[in-house]
Swiss-Prot record:
NCBIfam families: PRK05474.1, xylose_isom_A. Belongs to the xylose isomerase family. The keyword Cytoplasm applies. GO terms for biological process: D-xylose metabolic process. Its main location: cytoplasm. PANTHER family: PTHR48408, XYLOSE ISOMERASE (PTHR48408:SF1). Mg(2+) 2 binds at E267, H270, D306, D308. This is Xylose isomerase. It is found in: Cytoplasm.
Length: 440
């Protein structure tokens, strides 16, 4: 059965085409900085927003009428959902997908049901991957939707909930390994608190760290070679989450000795909620040595919640890609569309429109970022700004050649009187705009 039979495979037709079901800027075979756009972007479609979300919100029931979401045998519906998903991936021409365990398999009424259903669906997903050539960018476990996780999973006050969560992650990591996944993501949606009045912060942090240590141990035991990634988010659904932003996650990992085992998966909308730019979070991840992968979407700065809209800003993404490209690009990570159509976008075509437009935006932004990397104007000015630290005096300070006292004595003896130099922010912003809009 075809779920999108009236929609053709999406092809590159160029910027002059007015076909809404064609790529206008994303030519997967176009080479930029020595790689094709497909190799640079490593695009993935997420299962949850695209095939699981029924179009509901807190004020209304599901607005969609997807065939695979209708009542019926749960496992059969899961197989239909997988068929629809892989038809979608294939027609879109995207090389990767992502999932939560309970996106792809019914949870059932017990932990045994969960394990059995998930095992059957992992077999089926493997068949679909083999037939289509689509690969798994990353898997994860849903440890936030069921009421048992209302007080968290790893940070729950009940150790049986911790054990249930550990079982899910064990199976999901095993499945990711078996399906050839390149990463495994840990998003602590309810690893936080709603009130400090009933929360033991130290205990919950210790529990979370113990859980992560067990995941790391299992990864090595089964021989999984992919990356483990934490996805930072400041709040929602909890008031405050322990993986608030990139810097917070890094500090947590260092505190518990996990900084060499776990990296970050950065979502644009989560950066917005944390009061940061997407650019900031990506740059910070590289500075701290924990960059892993990206969830591509956007939030609404006028809303205080996670809107998960498709990315549409070439300007914002150009700076994000600039950081990624100048640090060598993705390794195991990629650009996963953690984005959903709007509740009123009920037609099957809308799923394609959202992804096609966003993929074109990624392609445009990456090419504009490549201009910034190639012309080296930003980096040249940055190097010039810090050039004195590469001189003998600067190197001596950083290498430990001075104590605080001896440096003070040296400064007094030389009568240092440094002068402020321009930061040239306006010039730098002009350079970015010239690259984005093709002015130079």
């Amino acid at each position: 059965m075809s779920y999108f039979e009236h929609i053709p495979a999406i092809r590159y037709e160029g910027p002059q085409s007015d076909n809404p079901l064609a790529y206008h800027h994303y030519d997967p075979d176009k080479r930029v900085l020595g790689k094709t756009l497909a190799e640079h972007l490593r695009i993935a479609v997420c299962y949850w927003h695209t095939f699981v979300w029924p179009g509901h919100d807190i004020f209304g029931q599901g607005a969609f009428q997807r065939p695979w979401q209708q009542p019926g045998d749960a496992l059969e519906r899961a197989r239909q959902k997988a068929d629809a998903a892989f038809e979608f991936f294939t027609k879109l021409g995207t090389p990767f997908y992502t999932f939560h365990d309970t996106d792809v398999a019914p949870e059932g009424d017990s932990l045994r049901d969960y394990a059995a259903n998930f095992a059957r669906m992992v077999d089926y997903l493997g068949e679909r991957q083999q037939a289509s050539g689509v690969r798994l960018l990353w898997g994860t476990a849903n440890l936030f939707s069921h009421p048992r996780f209302a007080a968290g999973a790893a940070t729950n006050p009940n150790p049986d909930v911790f054990a249930w969560a550990a079982t899910q992650v064990c199976h999901a990591l095993d499945a990711t390994h078996r399906l050839g996944g390149e990463n495994y993501v840990l998003w602590g949606g309810r690893e936080g608190y709603e009130t400090l009045l009933n929360t033991d912060l130290k205990r919950e942090r210790d529990q979370f760290a113990r859980f992560l240590s067990m995941v790391v141990e299992h990864k090595h035991r089964i021989g999984f070679k992919g990356a483990l990634l934490i996805e930072p988010k400041p709040q929602e659904p909890t008031k405050h989450q322990y993986d608030y932003d990139v810097a917070t996650v890094h500090g947590f990992l260092v505190q518990y000795g996990l900084q060499n085992e776990i990296r970050v998966n950065i979502e644009a909308n989560h950066a917005t909620l944390a009061g940061h730019s997407f650019h900031h979070e990506i740059a910070n991840a590289f500075a701290l040595g924990v960059f892993g992968s990206v969830d591509a979407n956007r939030g609404d700065p006028q809303n205080g919640w996670d809107t998960d809209q498709f990315p549409n800003s070439v300007e914002e993404l150009t700076l994000a890609f600039y950081e990624i490209l100048r640090h060598g690009g993705f390794t195991t990570g990629g650009m996963n569309f953690d984005a959903k159509v709007r509740r009123q976008s009920i037609d099957p075509e809308d799923l394609f429109y959202g992804h096609v437009g966003a993929i074109d935006v990624l392609a445009l932004a990456l090419e504009r970022a490549a201009v910034l990397v190639e012309n080296d104007r930003l980096d040249a000015l940055r190097r010039q700004r810090y050039a004195q630290w590469d001189d003998a005096f600067g190197r001596k300070i950083l290498s430990g050649g001075y104590t605080l006292e001896s440096l003070a004595a040296d400064a007094l003896a030389r009568g240092v009187n440094p002068r402020h130099a321009s930061g040239a922010q306006e010039r730098l912003e002009n350079i970015v705009n010239q690259a984005i809009y093709g002015l130079r």
